[in-house]
Curated annotation (Swiss-Prot):
It is found in: Cell outer membrane. Belongs to the LptD family. It comes from the Bacteria. GO terms for cellular component: cell outer membrane; transporter complex. This is LPS-assembly protein LptD. It comes from Escherichia coli O157:H7. Component of the lipopolysaccharide transport and assembly complex. Interacts with LptE and LptA.
Length: 784
């Protein structure tokens, strides 16, 4: 595991020192103009046995003990070179040593360099046996990478493993600019351990010290080391001034943590954000615990709440052990429904409507797998608190292929549903689904014939409250048995497009599927986990109209579709278009009176869907999709986008997305009842742009307009200045942050963010536009 955020003072000698410079080409090349390179042949291995070469205008001495060289003195051994006006060479026999100890004192215009560093000063000393070197009151410059500074005394020790600075400084700014620097009474940089120790560390902006620590141990390479990360600040209308100061803790080789005090002025307190990562034999995981001891804004808005403590707990784990055991955790829980409205968090969003808490343990061997899981939901609604959890759920699959010409499978599930309310129905559901397939295929097509049996048993309890308030009654014990038959055929035709586009190839891929499922009245079964599935082009060929098992719609239908693709001479897909429809011979029904279109008795071509993609050129791209459902009497969903993308930092995109209110109600019935902002559906047009506007300036922006409400939905504007030693980013965002039921209007949050990045700390000279675009509440999605 590597923490990818550069440490705040890691420059203190070196992340810069050992970063790979392969970045935003223009700026990176400009920054390297002031950086020296090692232009002599690099000597590998132990250089102590190599001869010492000395050139000078004059020489005198007492051979073999002492010698004095004056006038343009130049001493070389291996990769090391020492130059000075005068050099005194001393050679002494050391007891018990086969070789004499050779040292030099250098005076006047001392210059030492090797393949890693250049040291300059008025006075120097070196041990030619050990490569220990001292330079007093001088400057240093890293070779081949940004990094320079000054010190009263600069020392190279341990055959260049250690660089030690007494009263030293460091900056990655080029010569002539000291915009920022780090100074310390002593700095020890260990190249092997990739760590720097700094005593009495002060971080300076220009001549002004803004940060002090009596001792810091900081990472200066790829090895994980504890230390402060780059702080951040912003201003929002929700929390006013906010400031972050993260600290990275390298606990062990297989675990680390990031602890971030997050001050929020309006909340009147500090939120402690704690991220913990780990690796184990059972897999990898991440935990996040955020805790705000008290919140004065929440106290004012919820005077009847006993506690104003706000918190979030997130746990994600995925792993395999002994090649057969699978462990997965996806758990998010917050203190209250307003949490994601009040606080930005990468582990959840107010637009999700709920948080999931899921644990699962699986076992898998050849032809067999089984999973035991529990799943709960925390609904972010103060009006509708009803939600079902699976406590527990068992899923079992057994496969046996090549049974003669057939493939077989048996799927089984047992689950117990519990509601958060005491008066709602609960159930135990047992489902068995044996399947047999006859797959046939050749080079140009395939046909798959499938038959299965859907057998489900429900044992429902706690029905009194529901049955007393509804005309359709639920039964305690229900058995539902449904056969299913399906034939799915595909063909692929190809042709060369030599006449229109030499080297290009076009495919035509027709597909047809017949599906039959008889009708079973399911009105005596409560809907515990079923919802309408999205009917995009690929969704037209699903077996089920609904997810889950509580609603299995009858089907006597033919689905037809065709896809055409165009590939260039490098086999890159340049264009595709897909169009399909479902033709119903009889009405698709479940018997649920709450599904409004089941009363329409519609047949014929009811559902249409189409998708398209066109890579017009290397820089232009177009995507689109539309789904029409006559049962909803309108277009269910549609989306489109066109994009010009020159490179990562130069792009312009126009997009549109639409979802009808009937479609939202059908797919998210429980969320729809409380989501006032979506009662009229979604119809939003948007624009996203990122472009450098000057030599080192770039701008990024996004704007979304709700055509139903005739008002802005979301917007963002960011400006960044980049130089060789720092970058400044200022951003503004206005985003939808909930709905005021009393005033019946949307609630917006305005945020101003400010961030400074010290350059030369990592290999990234990019403008950061992708990060800014994807952090938006409606994140940028690539069209190309």
């Amino acid at each position: 595991m590597k923490k990818r955020i550069p440490t705040l003072l890691a420059t203190m000698i070196a992340t810069a020192l050992y970063s790979q410079q392969g970045l935003a080409a223009d700026l990176a090349s400009q920054c390297m103009l002031g950086v020296p390179s090692y232009d002599r042949p690099l000597v590998q291995g132990d250089t102590n046995d190599l001869p010492v070469t000395i050139n000078a205008n004059h020489a005198k001495g007492d051979y073999p003990d002492d010698a004095v060289f004056t006038g343009s003195v130049d001493i070389m051994q291996g990769n090391s070179r020492l130059q000075a006006d005068e050099v005194q060479l001393h050679q002494k026999e050391a007891p018990g040593q086969p070789e004499p100890v050779r040292t030099v004192d250098a005076l006047g215009n001392v210059h030492y360099d090797d393949n890693q560093v250049i040291l300059k000063g008025p006075k120097g000393w070196a041990n030619l046996n050990t490569k220990d070197t001292n330079v007093w009151e001088g400057d240093y410059q890293m070779v081949g990478r940004q990094g320079r500074g000054k010190a009263d005394l600069m020392k190279q020790r341990g055959e260049n493993r250690y660089t030690i600075l007494d009263n030293g400084s460091f900056t990655s700014c080029l010569p002539g600019s000291d915009t920022w620097s780090v100074v310390g009474s002593e700095i020890i940089h260990d190249r092997e351990e990739q760590v720097a120790e700094i005593w009495n560390a002060r971080f300076k902006v220009g001549p002004v010290s803004i940060f002090y620590s009596p001792y810091l141990q900081l990472p200066v390479g790829d090895k994980r080391r504890s230390g402060f990360l780059i702080p951040n600040a912003k201003y929002t209308t929700t929390n006013y001034f906010e400031f972050y100061l993260p600290y990275y803790w390298n606990i062990a080789p297989n675990m680390d943590a990031t602890i971030t005090p997050h001050y929020m002025h309006r909340r009147g307190n500090i939120m402690w954000e704690n991220e913990f990562r780990y690796l184990s034999q059972a897999g990898a995981g991440l935990m996040e615990l955020d805790y705000l001891p008290s919140d004065k804004v929440y106290e004012d808005e919820h005077p009847n709440d006993d506690s104003s403590r706000r918190w979030l707990f997130y746990w994600n784990h995925s792993g395999v052990m002994d090649q057969v055991w699978r462990f997965n955790v996806d758990y998010t829980k917050v203190s209250d429904p307003s949490y994601f409205n009040d606080f930005d968090n990468k582990y959840g969003s107010s637009t999700d409507g709920y948080a999931t808490q899921k644990f699962s343990v699986g076992y898998a061997v050849q032809n067999f797998n089984a999973t035991v899981s529990t799943k709960q939901f925390q609904v972010f609604s103060e009006q509708n608190t009803s939600s079902y959890s699976a406590e527990p759920q068992l899923d079992v699959n057994y496969y046996q292929n090549d049974v003669g010409p057939f493939d077989t499978r048996i799927y089984g599930q047992a689950v117990h549903f519990v509601n958060t309310r005491d008066d709602m129905p609960e159930a135990t559901r047992v489902h068995l689904e044996p399947t047999i397939n006859l797959p046939l295929s050749n080079n140009w097509g395939s046909i798959n014939t499938e038959a299965k049996l859907l057998a489900t048993h429900y044992q429902q309890t706690n029905l009194d409250w529901y049955n007393s308030r509804n005309t359709t009654k639920l039964d305690e014990s229900v058995n539902r048995v449904m056969p299913q038959f399906k034939v799915d055929g595909k063909m692929v035709f190809e042709r060369d497009m030599e006449m229109l586009a030499p080297g290009y190839t076009q495919t035509l891929e027709p597909r047809a599927q017949y599906l039959y499922v008889p009708y079973r009245d399911q009105s005596d079964i409560y809907n515990y986990d079923s919802s309408l599935l999205q009917s995009d082009y690929s969704g037209l060929f699903r077996d089920r109209t609904y997810g889950g098992l509580d609603r299995i719609a009858s089907a006597n239908q033919v689905t037809t579709g065709v896809t055409s693709r165009i590939y260039d001479d490098a086999a890159v897909e340049r264009f595709n278009i897909s169009v399909g429809q479902i033709y119903y011979f009889t009405e698709s029904r479940t018997g649920d009176d709450n599904i409004t279109w089941e009363n329409d008795d519609k047949t014929g071509s009811l559902v249409w869907a189409g998708d398209t993609y066109w890579r017009i050129s290397e820089r232009w791209g177009l995507r689109g999709g539309i789904q029409y459902d006559t049962r909803l009497d309108n277009v269910a969903t549609s989306n489109s986008s066109i994009e010009y993308r020159r490179d990562e930092d130069r792009l312009v995109q126009l997009n549109y997305r639409y979802a009808s209110p009937e479609y939202i109600q059908a797919t998210l019935p429980k969320y729809y009842s409380t989501a006032e902002q979506y009662k009229n559906g979604i119809s939003q047009v948007g624009a996203v742009a990122s472009w450098p506007i000057a030599d080192r300036w770039s701008i990024v922006g996004a704007y979304y307009y709700d055509t139903n409400a005739n008002k802005q939905a979301d917007s963002m504007l960011g400006v960044q200045y980049s130089s060789c030693c720092y970058a400044i980013r200022v951003g503004y965002e206005r985003k939808l942050n909930g709905w005021d039921n009393d005033k019946q209007h949307a609630v917006y949050d305005n945020a101003i963010g400010f961030n400074i990045e010290l350059r030369g700390l990592s290999s990234n000279y990019g403008l950061g536009t992708q990060e800014m675009l994807r952090s938006n509440i409606l994140p940028y999605q690539n069209t190309l």
